[in-house]
């Protein structure tokens, strides 16, 4: 017997399409994971920090401090 009879024939058609299906699905899953990680790891904490800052922010107090420091030329 020859060794060629023991090995199955390799699939020659549709190799690229099969690999693309697998890799596109994997890329989609990775992209969703990265988007979720960014949203909950970066965007949500940033949004909470901005909300907390503006909840306690006094613009007139900030303006008066800048005016006393001499930043403005028109408001002395």
Swiss-Prot record:
CDD domains: CcO_VIc
Pfam family name, one: COX6C
Transmembrane segments: 23-44
Biological process (GO), any one: oxidative phosphorylation
Pathway(s) this gene product operates in, as recorded in its UniProt entry: Energy metabolism; oxidative phosphorylation
Cleavable signal peptide: none
Alphabetical keyword list: Acetylation, Membrane, Mitochondrion, Mitochondrion inner membrane, Transmembrane, Transmembrane helix
Protein's membrane topology: Single-pass membrane protein
Family annotation (InterPro entries): Cytochrome_c_oxidase_VIc, Cytochrome_c_oxidase_VIc/VIIs, Cytochrome_c_oxidase_VIc_sf
Mitochondrial matrix domain ranges by topology: 4-22
Post-translational modification comment from the UniProt entry: Acetylation of Lys-61 is observed in liver mitochondria from fasted mice but not from fed mice.
The keyword GTP-binding appears for this protein: no
Keyword Transmembrane (UniProt): yes
Subcellular location: Mitochondrion inner membrane
Protein role: Component of the cytochrome c oxidase, the last enzyme in the mitochondrial electron transport chain which drives oxidative phosphorylation. The respiratory chain contains 3 multisubunit complexes succinate dehydrogenase (complex II, CII), ubiquinol-cytochrome c oxidoreductase (cytochrome b-c1 complex, complex III, CIII) and cytochrome c oxidase (complex IV, CIV), that cooperate to transfer electrons derived from NADH and succinate to molecular oxygen, creating an electrochemical gradient over the inner membrane that drives transmembrane transport and the ATP synthase.
Family per record: Belongs to the cytochrome c oxidase subunit 6c family.
Name this polypeptide is given: Cytochrome c oxidase subunit 6C
């Amino acid at each position: 017997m020859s060794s060629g009879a023991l090995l199955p024939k390799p699939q020659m058609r549709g190799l690229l399409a099969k690999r693309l299906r697998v890799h596109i699905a994997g890329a989609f899953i990775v992209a969703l994971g990265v988007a979720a990680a960014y949203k909950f790891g970066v965007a949500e904490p940033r949004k909470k920090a901005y909300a907390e800052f503006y909840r306690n922010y006094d613009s007139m107090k900030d303006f008066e401090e800048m005016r006393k420091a001499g930043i403005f030329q028109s408001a002395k």
